[in-house]
Regions:
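ATP-binding pocket architecture of kinase catalytic cores
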Residues: 27-108
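ATP-binding glycine-rich phosphate-binding loop
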Residues: 2-29, 40, 64
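An alpha-helical support segment within catalytic cores of ATP-dependent transferases
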Residues: 127-174, 282-300
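ATP/Mg2+ or Mg2+-diphosphate-binding catalytic cores
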Residues: 249-301
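A cross-family kinase active-site recognition segment
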Residues: 91-143
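Active-site acidic catalytic loop and adjacent metal/ATP-binding pocket
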Residues: 62, 155-200
Length: 301
């Protein structure tokens, strides 16, 4: 791969190492990552937000190849070269999450309607999947029903929001998790344009299903929310997204993509039972916090 990188980007590579589908490079006293694109990356979206990202010294830059393209195709695989900044590759904390990096251009969207449409499509897809592969997912049937039910409650909650606040587009990420690191956070190929509550909601949800000390996290979250500005509408959007069980749907999609064997069914049942217990316990704590802090409707998981 070294010769391809040097050819397409006219670099003289001093050091190169490979780890987890990406190459770490030192060239001309600068650090780079050459990575395969796994998610759908739209170059037009990057060009749209590039001026916004350029105002900050932490986001990585996508380097054009010698032909002026953001994406380089090698053996039918798509890659990008990222020029790194001087941030350490540490696991993100709650306070690393920003909700105020607004997109240039005074654009206004309706993310509530977009979420409703996408979530309804996701529910429809998984109901159809369960109907068509009922035998394969036999052991997971109760989990499907449980999480689909919660998903439908989340959609109903979104539909009940009648606040008139405008959805101002900000920098967010596809799926922020408690295990995500700063390299993920500042990588523009992971960035999407969405409502300001998306990242924090997905992070909270990830903590809820993975944390061994939810009480300590709730105290940290309380301090974080006090340090940020969210409207009542933002909080309702955040709460709805916390409730929507993306972690379950993501995992089933992973099963579908990797064609995991049915023999793992009982193992998966045990996993989802444990996650459901953590989720329900975490939602109880979050309900208490949100009820004390905000005047919003609360749903019991």
């Amino acid at each position: 791969m070294k010769k391809y990188i040097e050819y397409y980007y006219s670099l003289h590579i001093n050091q190169i190492s490979f780890d987890s589908s990406r190459y770490y490079i030192l060239a001309n006293n600068e650090k780079y990552i050459f990575k395969k694109l796994n998610l759908v990356f739209v170059g037009d979206n990057y060009n749209r937000i590039k001026s916004t990202l350029g105002k900050y010294n932490c986001f990585f830059d996508i380097v054009n190849n010698k032909y002026g393209n953001l994406i380089t195709t090698i053996s039918d695989e798509q890659y990008v070269l990222l020029r790194l900044t001087n941030i350490p590759n540490e696991t993100i904390s709650l306070y690393d999450i920003k909700n105020d990096i607004y997109i240039d251009g005074n654009l206004v969207s309706n993310f509530r309607e977009e979420w409703i449409t996408k979530w309804e499509q996701k529910i429809d897809y998984f109901e159809e999947l369960l109907a068509n592969k009922k035998e394969f997912y036999n052991e997971l049937y109760p989990a499907f029903q449980y999480y689909i039910g919660i998903g439908e409650e989340s959609i109903a909650y979104l539909k009940s929001i009648n606040d008139k606040d405008a959805d101002i587009p900000v920098i967010q990420h596809h799926r922020l998790k408690v295990s995500s690191n700063l390299y993920y956070y500042y990588d523009p190929t992971n960035i999407i344009i969405d409502h300001c509550s998306r990242d924090i909601a997905e992070y909270i949800k990830s903590v809820v299903i993975n944390s061994d000390d939810i009480e300590e996290f709730i105290m940290i979250l309380d301090e974080y929310l006090n340090s940020r500005v969210f409207s009542n509408y933002d909080i309702k959007m955040m709460y709805a997204r916390i409730l929507f069980p993306t972690f379950f749907f993501d995992y089933v999609e992973e099963i579908e993509m990797s064609s995991k064997k049915r023999s793992k069914g009982k193992e998966l049942v045990h996993t989802f039972e444990n996650i459901a217990l953590c989720y329900e316990n975490g939602i109880r704590y979050l309900n208490k916090l949100f009820k004390e802090k905000y005047s919003i409707p609360i749903i019991t998981a």
